[in-house]
Regions:
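Core subunits and conserved enzymes of cellular information-processing
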Residues: 1-133
Length: 133
């Protein structure tokens, strides 16, 4: 029996961060549509090797495979920007650039979760979920 997290996205990011620091290449997290979308965007951006959903009796699980430590696509920092107690929103023109464009910001827009570059191209603002580089 697991405790319910007040911020499931922060929990997912912490699981990924802890796995990287521990030298693990696989992370398991309880399934939700938002967590799956965030993980898929990180995979699409090249920060994760694979994202799968494992069907389970009590609950489905997201299985995330992380790149080998030392590759240039390794996550150096992954930080939650918008939190339940302090939501952070930005217009398309105000979305921050991370490490001069080498990192990404995930943005939750009306068209779904996308990277900062995709949001700027689509001229969509939204809630800033996290920054990764």
């Amino acid at each position: 029996m697991s405790l319910q997290s007040t911020d499931p996205i922060a929990d997912l990011l912490t699981r990924i961060r802890n796995a990287i620091m521990a030298g693990k290449n696989e992370v398991r997290a309880p399934h939700s549509k938002m967590k799956l979308t965030v993980a898929q965007q990180l995979k699409k951006s090249g920060y994760l090797s694979d994202v799968k959903v494992e069907k389970g009796t009590p609950r489905d699980t997201i299985v995330i495979t992380i790149h080998e430590i030392g590759t240039n696509t390794t996550i150096n920092e992954i930080t939650r920007l918008s939190k339940p107690g302090r939501r952070v929103y930005a217009a398309a023109t105000d979305i921050p650039r991370i490490k001069s464009g080498r990192g990404i910001v995930l943005v939750s827009t009306s068209q779904g979760v996308m990277t900062d570059n995709e949001a700027r191209k689509a001229k969509l603002g939204g809630e800033l979920i996290c920054k990764v580089y």
